Structures are given as structure tokens and as C-alpha cells.
Amino acid sequence: MKVRASVKKICRNCKVIKRHGVVRVICVEPKHKQRQG
């Protein structure tokens, strides 16, 4: 899980979603998981 100021899709499997007001990236590749913070 990377915590970043700006979350971006890294590959085509990445999805940007908003959970409880937190922007997250979920992906099949565990390295691509990100959260805004």
C-alpha cells in the first residue's frame, strides 16, 4: 500500500474508487495499491 498525495492508475487493471471519503486505487497487482493521504 502506497500512501500518496496524488493517486493515479498505473496499469489498465487499476481502478480508482472512493471509500469513506478516501480515494483509493485497487488492482490485481498488489504493488499498485494506493491510498490518498
From Swiss-Prot:
Keywords tagged on the record: Ribonucleoprotein, Ribosomal protein
Disulfide bond entries: none
Pfam (any one): Ribosomal_L36
GO terms, molecular function: structural constituent of ribosome
PROSITE patterns: RIBOSOMAL_L36
Gene Ontology BP terms: translation
Source organism, top-level taxon: Bacteria
InterPro entries in the record: Ribosomal_bL36, Ribosomal_bL36_sp
Cellular component, GO annotation: cytoplasm; ribonucleoprotein complex; ribosome
Recorded family membership: Belongs to the bacterial ribosomal protein bL36 family.
Protein name: Large ribosomal subunit protein bL36
Gene name as annotated: rpmJ1
